[in-house]
Amino acid sequence: MSLKKSPFFELRSGSVDTLLFTVKTTDLDALRTELVKRFEATPEFFADDVVAIDVRRLADGERVALADIRQMLNDVRMRPVGVVALATQGWAGEAGLPLLEARDRRAPAAKPADEAEPAAVLAVEAAAAPAAAAAPEQSSDPVPTLLQAGGQTLVIDRPLRSGQQIYAKGDLVVLAPVSHGAEIIAEGNIHIYAPLRGRALAGVHGNHDARIFCTCLEPELISIAGIYRTTENPLPADVLGKSVQIRLEEEKLMIEPLRLT
């Protein structure tokens, strides 16, 4: 086989960001009920988002019907793309979904099945076939925009419109408004010196020490290391539209006013 480069396609190692749907119960009826309850108030929020099914929290010997969970996620308009499992969970590869390797830093801990936990946002890599990735192109059109800085701080000084996305491998500094429908993602901290009206996700590879700093908090979603909060739960008056810092404390998001004077 010739090793000459093809002008028509390219295969190379890559990674994508996806929601991580962590399964902590084998009771699929209860899981379905909770999914409907969670999404009925904001049915469009995660529409068409890709998601990986994470079964690492299940106890030894427990199994779930991944095909049924896949259908549940399809029913709420999410797109399951694979399964994240432990090496001992060989059954996870029988559902017809590719096995993925999550690059989160913290190993999953056993928790009670009735303890509420939101989906996590993590970067996952396919264990079998590498993903083809195209170089991002700059455009003034309101389409998704992906920018990466290899471990360095990325500074954005232009407004972000609906549908645009920024990704930073280190810290991210934004000096202009983040509109509804726009998304900013960083593996480190996020600093926003303007109104945040879209989504902000910090510490996306499981960095629980990451923080979000914002001078005007009016978000659709905020997240650190996969722990998130949406506007489905209104923010308190002392932080809504104010300067704040957001951090994690014992797996809970803490939103605190910033004292700038």
Swiss-Prot record:
Function per UniProt: Cell division inhibitor that blocks the formation of polar Z ring septums. Rapidly oscillates between the poles of the cell to destabilize FtsZ filaments that have formed before they mature into polar Z rings. Prevents FtsZ polymerization.
Protein name: Probable septum site-determining protein MinC
InterPro entries according to UniProt: CAP/MinC_C (IPR016098), MinC (IPR013033), MinC_C_sf (IPR036145), MinC_N (IPR007874), Septum_form_inhib_MinC_C (IPR005526)
Similarity annotation: Belongs to the MinC family.
Alphabetical keyword list: Cell cycle, Cell division, Septation
Gene name for this UniProt entry: minC
Organism name: Burkholderia cenocepacia (strain ATCC BAA-245 / DSM 16553 / LMG 16656 / NCTC 13227 / J2315 / CF5610) (Burkholderia cepacia (strain J2315))
UniProt GO BP: cell morphogenesis; division septum assembly; regulation of cell division; regulation of cell septum assembly
Top-level taxon: Bacteria
Subunit structure, interactors included: Interacts with MinD and FtsZ.
